[in-house]
Amino acid sequence: MDVNNLKQILEETSALSDHKTKTEKYKSILQQLVESKQVAPLKVFITHLTDESTPLVISRTILLSFTSSHKTLPEDIQMELGIFVLDRIQNRVVAFEEQVSEIRYNLAKLYERQENWRESARCLIAIPLDSSQRVISPEYKVKIYVKIARLFLEEEESGQAETYINRASDSLHLVKNQKLILAHKTCFARIMDYKRMFLKASLRYYDLSQCLPKDTERMHALSCAIVCAILDKAGPQRSRTLATLYKDERSQQLGVYTFLEKMFLERILKKTEVKKFAEQLKPHQMALLSDGNTVLDRAVIEHNLLSASKLYNNITFDELGSLLEIQAEKAEKVASKMVCEERLIGSIDQIERLIQFENVGDSLTQWDKKIEGLCIHMNNIIESISKYPEFIV
Protein backbone atom coordinates (compact mmCIF):
# COMPACT_ATOMS: atom_id res chain seq x y z
CA MET A 1 0.00 0.00 0.00
CA ASP A 2 1.29 3.46 -0.94
CA VAL A 3 2.27 5.55 2.11
CA ASN A 4 0.52 8.74 0.93
CA ASN A 5 -2.62 6.79 0.09
CA LEU A 6 -2.46 5.14 3.53
CA LYS A 7 -2.23 8.51 5.28
CA GLN A 8 -5.35 9.66 3.42
CA ILE A 9 -7.25 6.50 4.44
CA LEU A 10 -6.18 6.94 8.07
CA GLU A 11 -7.38 10.56 8.11
CA GLU A 12 -10.73 9.50 6.70
CA THR A 13 -11.00 6.72 9.27
CA SER A 14 -10.20 9.04 12.18
CA ALA A 15 -13.00 11.34 11.02
CA LEU A 16 -15.63 8.60 11.38
CA SER A 17 -18.05 9.35 14.20
CA ASP A 18 -19.28 5.84 15.01
CA HIS A 19 -16.87 4.18 17.45
CA LYS A 20 -17.60 0.60 16.38
CA THR A 21 -17.28 1.40 12.66
CA LYS A 22 -14.01 3.25 13.28
CA THR A 23 -12.54 0.33 15.28
CA GLU A 24 -13.48 -2.23 12.63
CA LYS A 25 -11.99 -0.02 9.89
CA TYR A 26 -8.66 0.29 11.76
CA LYS A 27 -8.58 -3.49 12.26
CA SER A 28 -9.19 -4.02 8.55
CA ILE A 29 -6.34 -1.65 7.64
CA LEU A 30 -4.03 -3.39 10.12
CA GLN A 31 -4.82 -6.80 8.64
CA GLN A 32 -4.06 -5.59 5.10
CA LEU A 33 -0.76 -4.04 6.20
CA VAL A 34 0.35 -7.17 8.08
CA GLU A 35 -0.46 -9.32 5.05
CA SER A 36 1.59 -6.98 2.82
CA LYS A 37 4.63 -7.40 5.16
CA GLN A 38 5.87 -3.90 4.34
CA VAL A 39 7.61 -2.11 7.19
CA ALA A 40 7.20 1.53 6.08
CA PRO A 41 3.36 1.49 5.85
CA LEU A 42 3.13 -0.36 9.17
CA LYS A 43 5.26 2.33 10.85
CA VAL A 44 2.98 5.02 9.41
CA PHE A 45 -0.02 3.15 10.83
CA ILE A 46 1.64 2.80 14.26
CA THR A 47 2.62 6.49 14.28
CA HIS A 48 -0.98 7.49 13.56
CA LEU A 49 -2.36 5.05 16.12
CA THR A 50 -0.05 6.21 18.94
CA ASP A 51 -0.56 9.90 18.24
CA GLU A 52 -2.26 11.73 21.12
CA SER A 53 -4.99 12.91 18.74
CA THR A 54 -6.18 9.30 18.38
CA PRO A 55 -8.64 8.37 21.16
CA LEU A 56 -6.95 6.24 23.83
CA VAL A 57 -9.67 3.58 23.70
CA ILE A 58 -9.06 3.10 19.96
CA SER A 59 -5.26 3.10 20.39
CA ARG A 60 -5.38 0.45 23.12
CA THR A 61 -7.76 -1.83 21.23
CA ILE A 62 -5.90 -1.72 17.91
CA LEU A 63 -2.45 -1.99 19.52
CA LEU A 64 -3.63 -5.10 21.35
CA SER A 65 -4.70 -6.54 17.98
CA PHE A 66 -1.29 -5.58 16.60
CA THR A 67 0.53 -7.50 19.37
CA SER A 68 -1.16 -10.69 18.15
CA SER A 69 -1.19 -10.16 14.38
CA HIS A 70 2.42 -8.97 14.00
CA LYS A 71 3.69 -12.35 15.25
CA THR A 72 2.95 -13.76 11.78
CA LEU A 73 5.59 -11.46 10.26
CA PRO A 74 9.25 -12.46 9.74
CA GLU A 75 11.24 -12.24 12.99
CA ASP A 76 13.42 -9.33 11.89
CA ILE A 77 10.31 -7.27 11.05
CA GLN A 78 8.66 -8.27 14.34
CA MET A 79 11.70 -7.02 16.21
CA GLU A 80 11.94 -3.75 14.26
CA LEU A 81 8.25 -2.95 14.71
CA GLY A 82 8.23 -3.98 18.38
CA ILE A 83 11.10 -1.62 19.17
CA PHE A 84 9.40 1.12 17.11
CA VAL A 85 6.13 0.80 19.07
CA LEU A 86 7.94 0.92 22.43
CA ASP A 87 9.83 4.01 21.33
CA ARG A 88 6.58 5.71 20.28
CA ILE A 89 4.77 5.09 23.59
CA GLN A 90 7.69 5.33 26.03
CA ASN A 91 6.20 8.46 27.62
CA ARG A 92 2.73 6.89 27.89
CA VAL A 93 3.62 3.43 29.21
CA VAL A 94 1.08 3.62 32.03
CA ALA A 95 -1.72 3.98 29.47
CA PHE A 96 -0.53 0.96 27.46
CA GLU A 97 0.69 -1.48 30.13
CA GLU A 98 -0.95 -4.60 28.66
CA GLN A 99 0.25 -3.80 25.14
CA VAL A 100 3.78 -3.00 26.34
CA SER A 101 3.91 -6.28 28.28
CA GLU A 102 2.88 -8.32 25.23
CA ILE A 103 5.38 -6.60 22.95
CA ARG A 104 8.25 -6.92 25.43
CA TYR A 105 7.47 -10.59 26.03
CA ASN A 106 7.54 -11.27 22.29
CA LEU A 107 10.81 -9.33 21.91
CA ALA A 108 12.30 -11.40 24.74
CA LYS A 109 11.40 -14.60 22.86
CA LEU A 110 13.01 -13.25 19.68
CA TYR A 111 16.23 -12.30 21.48
CA GLU A 112 16.26 -15.69 23.20
CA ARG A 113 16.13 -17.46 19.83
CA GLN A 114 19.21 -15.45 18.84
CA GLU A 115 20.84 -16.55 22.14
CA ASN A 116 21.06 -12.91 23.17
CA TRP A 117 20.26 -13.81 26.77
CA ARG A 118 21.02 -10.42 28.29
CA GLU A 119 18.73 -8.44 25.95
CA SER A 120 16.01 -11.02 26.40
CA ALA A 121 16.25 -10.63 30.19
CA ARG A 122 16.21 -6.83 29.90
CA CYS A 123 12.97 -6.98 27.91
CA LEU A 124 11.31 -9.10 30.59
CA ILE A 125 12.63 -6.94 33.45
CA ALA A 126 10.95 -3.92 31.84
CA ILE A 127 7.52 -5.58 31.95
CA PRO A 128 5.46 -3.78 34.65
CA LEU A 129 4.48 -6.43 37.23
CA ASP A 130 3.40 -4.17 40.09
CA SER A 131 0.57 -2.18 38.60
CA SER A 132 -2.57 -0.46 39.80
CA GLN A 133 -3.89 -0.33 36.23
CA ARG A 134 -4.49 -4.06 35.75
CA VAL A 135 -4.74 -7.30 37.71
CA ILE A 136 -1.62 -9.45 37.40
CA SER A 137 -1.88 -13.08 38.50
CA PRO A 138 0.77 -14.69 40.76
CA GLU A 139 1.34 -17.31 38.01
CA TYR A 140 2.27 -14.59 35.51
CA LYS A 141 4.66 -12.91 37.95
CA VAL A 142 6.40 -16.18 38.84
CA LYS A 143 6.59 -17.14 35.16
CA ILE A 144 8.36 -13.88 34.26
CA TYR A 145 10.73 -13.93 37.24
CA VAL A 146 11.72 -17.57 36.66
CA LYS A 147 12.34 -16.87 32.98
CA ILE A 148 14.54 -13.86 33.85
CA ALA A 149 16.51 -15.99 36.32
CA ARG A 150 17.01 -18.72 33.73
CA LEU A 151 18.25 -16.20 31.15
CA PHE A 152 20.78 -14.75 33.60
CA LEU A 153 21.99 -18.29 34.31
CA GLU A 154 22.67 -18.70 30.59
CA GLU A 155 24.90 -15.62 30.95
CA GLU A 156 26.44 -17.25 34.05
CA GLU A 157 25.30 -14.35 36.23
CA SER A 158 24.14 -16.34 39.24
CA GLY A 159 23.85 -13.23 41.44
CA GLN A 160 21.28 -11.59 39.17
CA ALA A 161 19.53 -14.93 38.70
CA GLU A 162 19.22 -15.35 42.47
CA THR A 163 17.65 -11.89 42.82
CA TYR A 164 14.80 -12.79 40.48
CA ILE A 165 14.30 -16.36 41.68
CA ASN A 166 13.88 -14.93 45.20
CA ARG A 167 11.21 -12.57 43.87
CA ALA A 168 9.48 -15.56 42.31
CA SER A 169 9.67 -17.38 45.66
CA ASP A 170 7.61 -14.61 47.30
CA SER A 171 4.56 -15.53 45.18
CA LEU A 172 5.23 -19.24 44.70
CA HIS A 173 2.84 -20.31 47.49
CA LEU A 174 -0.02 -18.82 45.44
CA VAL A 175 0.86 -20.84 42.32
CA LYS A 176 -0.90 -24.13 41.52
CA ASN A 177 0.66 -24.78 38.11
CA GLN A 178 2.96 -27.77 38.74
CA LYS A 179 5.01 -27.14 35.60
CA LEU A 180 5.83 -23.64 36.84
CA ILE A 181 6.65 -24.90 40.34
CA LEU A 182 9.08 -27.46 38.87
CA ALA A 183 10.64 -24.75 36.67
CA HIS A 184 11.25 -22.69 39.82
CA LYS A 185 12.79 -25.68 41.64
CA THR A 186 15.05 -26.46 38.68
CA CYS A 187 16.22 -22.87 38.40
CA PHE A 188 16.89 -22.67 42.15
CA ALA A 189 18.98 -25.86 42.03
CA ARG A 190 21.03 -24.48 39.13
CA ILE A 191 21.64 -21.23 41.03
CA MET A 192 22.95 -23.15 44.06
CA ASP A 193 25.16 -25.10 41.63
CA TYR A 194 26.55 -21.92 40.01
CA LYS A 195 27.18 -20.36 43.43
CA ARG A 196 29.17 -23.48 44.42
CA MET A 197 26.74 -24.26 47.23
CA PHE A 198 27.06 -27.85 46.12
CA LEU A 199 25.42 -29.64 49.04
CA LYS A 200 22.24 -27.55 48.75
CA ALA A 201 22.30 -27.98 44.96
CA SER A 202 22.70 -31.74 45.32
CA LEU A 203 19.70 -32.03 47.64
CA ARG A 204 17.60 -29.86 45.30
CA TYR A 205 18.59 -31.90 42.25
CA TYR A 206 17.86 -35.14 44.09
CA ASP A 207 14.39 -33.88 44.97
CA LEU A 208 13.84 -33.05 41.28
CA SER A 209 15.06 -36.51 40.27
CA GLN A 210 11.99 -37.92 41.99
CA CYS A 211 9.30 -35.52 40.78
CA LEU A 212 10.14 -34.38 37.21
CA PRO A 213 7.64 -35.76 34.66
CA LYS A 214 10.03 -37.39 32.15
CA ASP A 215 12.38 -40.26 32.95
CA THR A 216 15.25 -38.61 31.02
CA GLU A 217 14.80 -35.42 33.06
CA ARG A 218 14.77 -37.37 36.34
CA MET A 219 17.97 -39.22 35.42
CA HIS A 220 19.67 -35.97 34.38
CA ALA A 221 18.70 -34.40 37.71
CA LEU A 222 20.07 -37.45 39.55
CA SER A 223 23.35 -37.16 37.65
CA CYS A 224 23.57 -33.46 38.59
CA ALA A 225 22.88 -34.36 42.23
CA ILE A 226 25.76 -36.86 42.23
CA VAL A 227 28.19 -34.43 40.58
CA CYS A 228 27.35 -31.66 43.08
CA ALA A 229 27.69 -34.04 46.05
CA ILE A 230 31.12 -35.11 44.79
CA LEU A 231 32.23 -31.48 44.40
CA ASP A 232 31.14 -30.47 47.91
CA LYS A 233 33.58 -30.20 50.80
CA ALA A 234 34.44 -33.54 52.39
CA GLY A 235 32.80 -34.17 55.74
CA PRO A 236 29.89 -35.89 57.56
CA GLN A 237 27.15 -34.00 55.68
CA ARG A 238 28.55 -34.93 52.30
CA SER A 239 29.02 -38.54 53.45
CA ARG A 240 25.31 -38.77 54.28
CA THR A 241 24.37 -37.32 50.89
CA LEU A 242 26.74 -39.68 49.05
CA ALA A 243 25.20 -42.61 50.95
CA THR A 244 21.69 -41.63 49.85
CA LEU A 245 22.76 -41.28 46.22
CA TYR A 246 24.81 -44.49 46.23
CA LYS A 247 21.93 -46.52 47.65
CA ASP A 248 19.54 -45.21 44.98
CA GLU A 249 19.38 -48.10 42.47
CA ARG A 250 19.02 -45.68 39.54
CA SER A 251 22.55 -44.37 40.13
CA GLN A 252 24.02 -47.60 38.73
CA GLN A 253 22.73 -46.63 35.27
CA LEU A 254 24.80 -43.42 35.19
CA GLY A 255 28.32 -42.86 33.93
CA VAL A 256 29.31 -41.13 37.19
CA TYR A 257 28.44 -44.20 39.28
CA THR A 258 32.00 -45.63 39.35
CA PHE A 259 33.36 -42.36 40.71
CA LEU A 260 30.48 -42.11 43.20
CA GLU A 261 31.17 -45.65 44.42
CA LYS A 262 34.84 -44.94 45.13
CA MET A 263 33.87 -41.76 46.96
CA PHE A 264 31.26 -43.55 49.07
CA LEU A 265 33.57 -46.47 49.90
CA GLU A 266 36.28 -43.96 50.86
CA ARG A 267 38.84 -45.28 48.42
CA ILE A 268 41.75 -43.13 47.29
CA LEU A 269 41.12 -41.64 43.84
CA LYS A 270 43.74 -41.75 41.09
CA LYS A 271 44.57 -38.92 38.71
CA THR A 272 43.32 -40.85 35.67
CA GLU A 273 39.93 -41.35 37.34
CA VAL A 274 39.72 -37.70 38.31
CA LYS A 275 40.63 -36.58 34.79
CA LYS A 276 37.91 -38.76 33.27
CA PHE A 277 35.32 -37.42 35.71
CA ALA A 278 36.39 -33.81 35.03
CA GLU A 279 35.39 -34.20 31.37
CA GLN A 280 31.74 -34.27 32.45
CA LEU A 281 31.88 -31.01 34.41
CA LYS A 282 30.47 -27.65 33.34
CA PRO A 283 32.77 -24.59 32.98
CA HIS A 284 31.65 -22.99 36.27
CA GLN A 285 32.43 -26.27 38.07
CA MET A 286 36.01 -26.09 36.80
CA ALA A 287 36.62 -22.47 37.84
CA LEU A 288 39.80 -21.75 39.79
CA LEU A 289 39.65 -21.04 43.52
CA SER A 290 41.82 -18.49 45.34
CA ASP A 291 44.52 -21.11 46.00
CA GLY A 292 44.85 -21.97 42.30
CA ASN A 293 42.99 -25.28 42.52
CA THR A 294 39.66 -26.11 40.92
CA VAL A 295 36.62 -27.12 42.97
CA LEU A 296 37.23 -30.71 41.87
CA ASP A 297 40.89 -30.56 42.94
CA ARG A 298 39.83 -29.43 46.41
CA ALA A 299 37.13 -32.11 46.68
CA VAL A 300 39.52 -34.89 45.60
CA ILE A 301 42.35 -33.74 47.90
CA GLU A 302 40.00 -33.59 50.90
CA HIS A 303 38.43 -36.94 50.00
CA ASN A 304 41.83 -38.63 49.66
CA LEU A 305 42.89 -37.13 52.97
CA LEU A 306 39.82 -38.60 54.68
CA SER A 307 40.50 -41.93 52.98
CA ALA A 308 44.08 -41.83 54.25
CA SER A 309 42.78 -41.25 57.79
CA LYS A 310 41.01 -44.64 57.56
CA LEU A 311 44.23 -46.39 56.48
CA TYR A 312 46.80 -44.79 58.81
CA ASN A 313 46.96 -44.02 62.50
CA ASN A 314 49.40 -41.22 61.75
CA ILE A 315 51.36 -39.87 58.80
CA THR A 316 54.08 -37.25 58.25
CA PHE A 317 53.44 -34.11 56.19
CA ASP A 318 55.89 -35.31 53.53
CA GLU A 319 54.25 -38.72 53.22
CA LEU A 320 50.79 -37.18 53.11
CA GLY A 321 51.89 -34.71 50.43
CA SER A 322 53.29 -37.59 48.38
CA LEU A 323 50.06 -39.56 48.81
CA LEU A 324 47.87 -36.60 47.82
CA GLU A 325 50.32 -35.58 45.05
CA ILE A 326 50.69 -32.06 46.46
CA GLN A 327 53.38 -30.22 48.43
CA ALA A 328 53.82 -31.15 52.10
CA GLU A 329 53.03 -27.58 53.24
CA LYS A 330 49.79 -27.61 51.28
CA ALA A 331 48.84 -31.01 52.71
CA GLU A 332 49.37 -29.63 56.22
CA LYS A 333 47.23 -26.57 55.42
CA VAL A 334 44.36 -28.69 54.06
CA ALA A 335 44.47 -31.03 57.06
CA SER A 336 44.57 -28.10 59.52
CA LYS A 337 41.52 -26.51 57.94
CA MET A 338 39.55 -29.76 57.98
CA VAL A 339 40.43 -30.42 61.62
CA CYS A 340 39.41 -26.87 62.61
CA GLU A 341 36.08 -27.25 60.77
CA GLU A 342 35.55 -30.66 62.47
CA ARG A 343 35.43 -32.42 59.12
CA LEU A 344 38.47 -34.49 60.06
CA ILE A 345 39.06 -35.99 63.53
CA GLY A 346 42.71 -35.77 64.51
CA SER A 347 45.54 -33.60 65.78
CA ILE A 348 48.58 -31.98 64.20
CA ASP A 349 52.07 -31.95 65.68
CA GLN A 350 53.98 -29.23 63.84
CA ILE A 351 57.24 -29.94 65.68
CA GLU A 352 57.25 -33.60 64.63
CA ARG A 353 55.56 -32.65 61.30
CA LEU A 354 53.02 -35.37 61.97
CA ILE A 355 49.25 -35.78 61.71
CA GLN A 356 47.64 -38.13 64.24
CA PHE A 357 44.28 -39.52 63.11
CA GLU A 358 41.49 -40.63 65.43
CA ASN A 359 39.65 -43.41 63.66
CA VAL A 360 36.22 -43.10 65.15
CA GLY A 361 34.42 -44.34 62.06
CA ASP A 362 32.12 -42.39 59.84
CA SER A 363 29.03 -40.62 61.17
CA LEU A 364 26.60 -43.18 59.74
CA THR A 365 28.41 -46.06 61.47
CA GLN A 366 28.45 -44.14 64.74
CA TRP A 367 24.74 -43.45 64.44
CA ASP A 368 24.00 -47.13 63.76
CA LYS A 369 26.07 -48.17 66.77
CA LYS A 370 24.23 -45.72 69.03
CA ILE A 371 20.86 -47.06 67.86
CA GLU A 372 22.09 -50.64 68.38
CA GLY A 373 23.34 -49.78 71.87
CA LEU A 374 20.02 -48.16 72.78
CA CYS A 375 18.06 -51.21 71.58
CA ILE A 376 20.29 -53.58 73.60
CA HIS A 377 19.87 -51.40 76.69
CA MET A 378 16.06 -51.41 76.27
CA ASN A 379 16.06 -55.22 75.89
CA ASN A 380 18.06 -55.56 79.11
CA ILE A 381 15.55 -53.38 80.96
CA ILE A 382 12.61 -55.43 79.65
CA GLU A 383 14.32 -58.70 80.63
CA SER A 384 15.05 -57.37 84.12
CA ILE A 385 11.43 -56.32 84.58
CA SER A 386 10.12 -59.69 83.35
CA LYS A 387 12.08 -61.47 86.13
CA TYR A 388 9.84 -59.83 88.74
CA PRO A 389 6.30 -59.92 87.32
CA GLU A 390 4.81 -59.23 90.77
CA PHE A 391 6.10 -55.65 90.55
CA ILE A 392 4.34 -55.00 87.26
CA VAL A 393 1.10 -53.03 87.70
From Swiss-Prot:
SMART domains: PINT (SM00088)
Record's GO cellular component terms: COP9 signalosome; cytoplasm
Record domain PCI: where: 197-362
Keywords: Cytoplasm, Nucleus, Signalosome
Keyword Cell membrane listed: no
SUPFAM superfamilies in alphabetical order: Winged helix' DNA-binding domain
Compartment(s): Cytoplasm; Nucleus
UniProt keyword Cell inner membrane present: no
PROSITE patterns linked to this entry: PCI
A Pfam family hit: PSMD12-CSN4_N
Matches recorded under InterPro entries: PCI_dom, PSMD12-CSN4-like_N, PSMD12/CSN4, WH-like_DNA-bd_sf, WH_DNA-bd_sf
Superkingdom of origin organism: Eukaryota
Primary localisation category: cytoplasm
PANTHER family registered for this protein in UniProt: 26S PROTEASOME NON-ATPASE REGULATORY SUBUNIT 12/COP9 SIGNALOSOME COMPLEX SUBUNIT 4 (PTHR10855), COP9 SIGNALOSOME COMPLEX SUBUNIT 4 (PTHR10855:SF2)
Quaternary structure (record): Component of the CSN complex. The holocomplex is comprised of 8 subunits csn1-8. In the complex, it probably interacts directly with csn1, csn2, csn3, csn4, csn6 and csn8.
Similarity annotation: Belongs to the CSN4 family.
Function: Component of the COP9 signalosome complex (CSN), a complex involved in various cellular and developmental processes. The CSN complex is an essential regulator of the ubiquitin (Ubl) conjugation pathway by mediating the deneddylation of the cullin subunits of E3 ligase complexes, leading to modify the Ubl ligase activity.
Name recorded for this polypeptide: COP9 signalosome complex subunit 4
Source species: Dictyostelium discoideum
